[in-house]
């Protein structure tokens, strides 16, 4: 519906701004979600998709060099589990740069230089307010606003958010939230 076309436009404009190519597929769009919840979901989803294109999907020549199709794939999948909706946003991009996340976390005093941290623990850091691995700010990112908005949204919806990633293969963001505001 209206939200799906807005999300598609968002991906197209982010691709134009970054010189990348990506195709968005939405699965389970007919999952029963309360319209109030859907309205509140629009902004977080725009952040999630912008992030997938800007940080995940590589430029066409980099994808070709990695043996991938020039056009990246982003799948937004919705499923219902009892009173909850589980949303997965998967991209086939470069995956999280765990080393860059660690460097930034040490610079910001979130980790000490010799403190061990698993990839999952490092992935959780990207959900923190003000966290970015970008050295420069562009119109899309670098301000550290984005996934923390999604994390805060999940908290207000009694939901949860999880990020997992495999180098060179992409990133999956899982968002769980109540299907209706009354539950």
Regions found by a protein language model. Name each.
Residues 2-16:
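Short beta-to-alpha transition helix within the HATPase_c
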Residues 13, 17-183:
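Conserved glycine-centered short motifs in functionally critical loops
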């Amino acid at each position: 519906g209206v939200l799906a076309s807005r999300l598609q436009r968002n991906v197209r404009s982010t691709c134009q701004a970054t010189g990348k190519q990506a195709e968005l597929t939405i699965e389970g769009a007919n999952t029963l979600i309360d319209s109030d919840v859907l309205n509140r979901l629009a902004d977080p989803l725009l952040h999630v998709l912008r992030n997938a294109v800007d940080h995940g999907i590589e430029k066409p020549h980099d994808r070709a060099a990695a043996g991938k199709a020039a056009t990246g794939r982003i799948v937004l999948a919705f499923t219902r589990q009892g009173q909850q909706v589980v949303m997965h946003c998967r991209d086939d991009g470069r995956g999280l740069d765990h080393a860059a996340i660690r460097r930034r976390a040490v610079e910001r005093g979130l980790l000490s230089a010799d403190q061990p941290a698993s990839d999952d623990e490092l992935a959780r850091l990207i959900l923190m307010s003000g966290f970015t691995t970008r050295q420069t700010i562009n119109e899309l990112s670098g301000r550290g606003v984005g996934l923390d908005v999604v994390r805060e949204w999940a908290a207000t919806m009694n939901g949860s958010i999880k990020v997992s990633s495999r180098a060179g293969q992409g990133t999956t963001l899982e968002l769980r939230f109540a299907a209706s505001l009354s539950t």
